């Protein structure tokens, strides 16, 4: 579905968990993936998975609150072609994080965002 957007892309995997989404993007040709999760345990798992898959050189991992990580990316003037958001279920972080990404100017002009959300919540359609 998003294969064309992945190749050579700068990817953000926010609320990365075990890193599976970002690692999949790297395996399909993404140039670089920035992983963020606030859980130290998740960050350890992501680091292990990157080592196992051989994608360490194409990855950057931060372990911080999502808003802090996004602010740090803005200071570095990063732009993302593909944003993967898989937040904790029913916490409202889906909308908040996507709005913050837009407000901070982190999305490239043709950015694609893929966001996991509650099936009953269709409000993201309007962002």
Label each PLM-derived region with a short phrase:
Residues 1-125:
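Class I S-adenosyl-L-methionine-dependent methyltransferase catalytic core
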């Amino acid at each position: 579905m998003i294969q064309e957007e992945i190749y050579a892309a700068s990817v953000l995997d926010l609320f990365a968990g075990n890193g599976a989404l970002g690692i999949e993007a790297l395996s399909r040709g993404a140039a670089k993936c920035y992983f963020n999760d606030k859980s130290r345990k998740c960050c350890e798992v992501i680091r292990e998975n990157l080592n196992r898959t051989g994608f360490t050189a194409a990855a950057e991992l931060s372990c911080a609150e999502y808003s802090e990580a996004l602010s740090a990316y803005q200071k570095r003037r990063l732009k993302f072609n593909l944003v993967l958001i898989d937040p904790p279920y029913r916490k409202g972080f889906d909308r908040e994080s996507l709005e913050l990404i837009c407000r901070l100017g982190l999305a490239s002009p043709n950015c694609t965002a893929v966001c996991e959300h509650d099936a009953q919540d269709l409000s993201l359609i309007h962002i």
